[in-house]
Amino acid sequence: MGLSGWAVALAVAALVSSAATPAPKVARIIIHKSAHTMQLRDKDGAVTTYPVSLGPGGAGVKHREGDKVTPVGHYHVVNRGPSKSFTIFMRLDYPNAEDRKRFNALKADGTLPAGATIGGDIGIHGGTPEGWNKRDDVTTAQRDWTLGCISVEDDEIRAIAKRVPDGKPVDIDDE
């Protein structure tokens, strides 16, 4: 093989090895509601950041089903699956024990009506509303469209789902 043949072979080998190297698995997900960001952190501390859309219910903890608030707290990815509306849906373990305790206290003191329910089906998913792109410079009111979930672009949720195994912690804060 001549010199140019070796150069081509080395270039192809480098391309194949870099393409075959999967992104590192995620150790923790951190979602900052005010910043509208989701950070994927691997075991070495490397961070990948994505812009996110949330529920339009604003800052603070989720009180009840239908308040359109993205919850604040410590959760885990419990399972995932394909979704016609959201490409992939990665379900979180909301409500957790702390959420249930808060909800029951709010019902007991009359802050919430007797018929209120705590809700569920909170997750990380794709599915951008038709006609706009989260990459555009839009206001928070235009950006926040979910019922309390965390949404990224469809191509992003595909990449995220490959890197985040079930059971991984998800911390959501108001920062």
Tell what function each PLM region has.
Residues P22-A27, K33-S34, P51-N79, F103-G110, ...:
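N-terminal post-signal-peptidase region of extra-cytosolic proteins
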Residues P24, G81-E175:
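Exported/periplasmic cell-wall-interacting domains
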